[in-house]
């Protein structure tokens, strides 16, 4: 059984309700049909029901078991307006502005549904930027208790079954924080270890990646990773973690023996923490596009309720996978 099939099985054990607000995207319609067919989650779509069903007919898929909520006709609109206003009034939100946003911005509408406990999570981004998808989630849902920083990760399911957790890795931060400070990198390592345990396997082994291994290069970027590693050891001593290794020293035991003898990672990393968003974004896309890996994300970690992004280059199968992962995250909230 593949990694994502195991996640689907977990999702079915305690079925959750996930919002897919991008009802004008054919990949989303195809994914919604498959999700309800496989019993992975209950799906809410946002928009005009007639248009959505017309799209389903054109694609020859069955969306009869999908719930459609039209912001213009839902009896809960006033409740949602009040909830958005109360959540954001300190930032200048008015009831009038909240109503206008909810009638026109389906992403925000979906997030407010999650905030109101009318859905357990949301997945979007097939036709919106990461910023457009995640900004309202961060503004409305806030961080989970005890979490210092919201960050983004990818689950990378590779063909290299002798590495990672049977070929599966967690990459962070590949979608949100542009240039994390040492303190933020350490926090990302901690939340990534929790995400790994909840979604992939019991024993995260974390590499704080750099272009240097144990002082082989001198640069401010290297210093940042070294300091992040020191902070992580101090604040999160339970983590199996080391820095700063190059990628080969993180993944190949023979290279680790030569470059980083005595490292607790020892070439067996399954959680890769990138020094900045450039490295993380490029890294996951290289592994996906040239290495043939399945990439699920960017998934948010550290947020109060699960809202996850999609690459605009995603397939409908990717959406199914991210919804399954989101449903499992929702089981753990």
Language model features: what each stretch is:
Residues 1-266, 271-333:
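Anion-binding alpha/beta catalytic cores of soluble intermediary-metabolism enzymes, centered on
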